[in-house]
């Protein structure tokens, strides 16, 4: 599978979880044949309580989805992380997306110990996650290489923003997922073989087709550049609300939708869909 949608968690105006919209979000990924990531930064995992995560897992498990479901794990305590994984893997999920711990900025040996402890408790596959902007530290390529032989370590998501870093991860032999929609063409050339996509939330089929053809497309770049002006998931929720895919573009504190940049360009960004479809068709015919 080349695309996993980094799914939003839709909220109602009162900031409670909108389960009807959530079903629509994950069903759209299933229809496109994309995998699903829950509770990542796009899904505002840090703003969800333990009980809310359980309610989402319970709800999604009743949908009998026919695509892989991975659960994002974000914490600073290794014991808390291990306990959460031990509990969450009782549900019918397919694995976990695990970054370096937040805030503490561990070095090479600390990162090895962190992932070693987590892998020791997991019975599901794990994708390691490099996201230095969010966590405060880069995932060391040496750490990735040290877990290559572990049967449950199946890949790396790289949101480091550099094709060079992607190449180092790819040298390990593990599968690398690009964590930035806009960088996919460059990271594909550097060894990435899939994308964990934010844009798949709003245009799941187009994301699938864009990743499959693997070449730069100007309309895609334009949308990604607009999204990157604001903290994720402000932009993607605004796009989805404008297309009536979700009830509203609400995000939970400390995020605020009032921080969305260039809202006046929203209609122009939505119009990129038709251009993107045309460009993808043109590329496929070449």
From Swiss-Prot:
Lineage: Bacteria, Pseudomonadati, Chlamydiota, Chlamydiia, Chlamydiales
Enzyme class: lyase
Site for Part of a proton relay during catalysis, residues: 41, 103
Oligomer status and interactors: Homotetramer; dimer of dimers.
Keyword Lyase: yes
Gene: dapA
Entry's EC annotation: 4.3.3.7
Subcellular location: Cytoplasm
Associated pathway: Amino-acid biosynthesis; L-lysine biosynthesis via DAP pathway; (S)-tetrahydrodipicolinate from L-aspartate: step 3/4
Domain of life, per lineage: Bacteria
GO molecular function terms attached to this record: 4-hydroxy-tetrahydrodipicolinate synthase activity
Binding positions (pyruvate): 42, 196
NCBIfam families (alphabetical): dapA
One of the GO biological process terms: lysine biosynthetic process via diaminopimelate
Annotated Gene Ontology cellular component terms: cytosol
Keywords: Amino-acid biosynthesis, Cytoplasm, Diaminopimelate biosynthesis, Lyase, Lysine biosynthesis, Schiff base
SMART domains, alphabetized: DHDPS
Family that this chain belongs to: Belongs to the DapA family.
Cross-referenced InterPro entries: Aldolase_TIM, DapA, DapA-like, Schiff_base-form_aldolases_AS, Schiff_base-form_aldolases_CS
Species the sequence originates in: Chlamydia trachomatis serovar D (strain ATCC VR-885 / DSM 19411 / UW-3/Cx)
Catalysed reactions listed for this entry: L-aspartate 4-semialdehyde + pyruvate = (2S,4S)-4-hydroxy-2,3,4,5-tetrahydrodipicolinate + H2O + H(+)
Active-site residues from the entry: 129 (proton donor/acceptor), 157 (schiff-base intermediate with substrate)
Protein name: 4-hydroxy-tetrahydrodipicolinate synthase
Physiological role: Catalyzes the condensation of (S)-aspartate-beta-semialdehyde [(S)-ASA] and pyruvate to 4-hydroxy-tetrahydrodipicolinate (HTPA).
């Amino acid at each position: 599978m080349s695309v996993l949608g980094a799914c939003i968690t839709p909220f109602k105006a009162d900031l409670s979880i909108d389960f009807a919209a959530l079903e629509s979000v994950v069903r759209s990924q299933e229809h496109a044949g994309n995998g699903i990531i829950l509770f990542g930064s796009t899904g505002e995992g840090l703003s969800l309580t333990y009980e809310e995560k359980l309610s989402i897992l319970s709800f999604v498990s009743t949908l009998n989805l026919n695509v892989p479901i991975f659960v994002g794990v974000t914490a600073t305590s290794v014991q808390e992380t291990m306990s959460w994984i031990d509990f969450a893997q009782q549900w019918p999920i397919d694995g976990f997306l695990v970054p370096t711990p937040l805030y503490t900025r561990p070095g090479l040996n600390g990162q090895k110990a962190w992932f070693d402890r987590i892998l020791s408790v997991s019975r599901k596959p794990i994708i390691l996650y490099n996201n230095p902007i969010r966590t405060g530290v880069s995932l060391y390529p040496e750490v990735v290489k040290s877990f290559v032989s572990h049967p449950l370590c199946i890949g790396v998501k790289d949101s480091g923003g550099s094709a060079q870093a992607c190449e180092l991860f790819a040298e390990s032999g593990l599968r690398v997922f690009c964590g930035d929609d806009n960088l996919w063409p460059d990271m594909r050339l550097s060894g990435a073989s899939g994308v964990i996509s934010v844009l798949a939330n709003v245009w799941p089929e187009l994301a699938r087709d864009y990743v499959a053809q693997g070449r730069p497309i100007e309309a895609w770049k334009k949308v990604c550049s607009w999204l990157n002006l604001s903290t994720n998931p402000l932009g993607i929720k605004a796009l989805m609300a404008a297309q009536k895919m979700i009830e509203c573009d609400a995000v939970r504190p400390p995020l605020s939708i009032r921080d969305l940049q260039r809202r006046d360009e929203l209609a122009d960004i939505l119009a990129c869909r038709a251009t993107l479809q045309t460009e993808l068709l043109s590329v496929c015919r070449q």
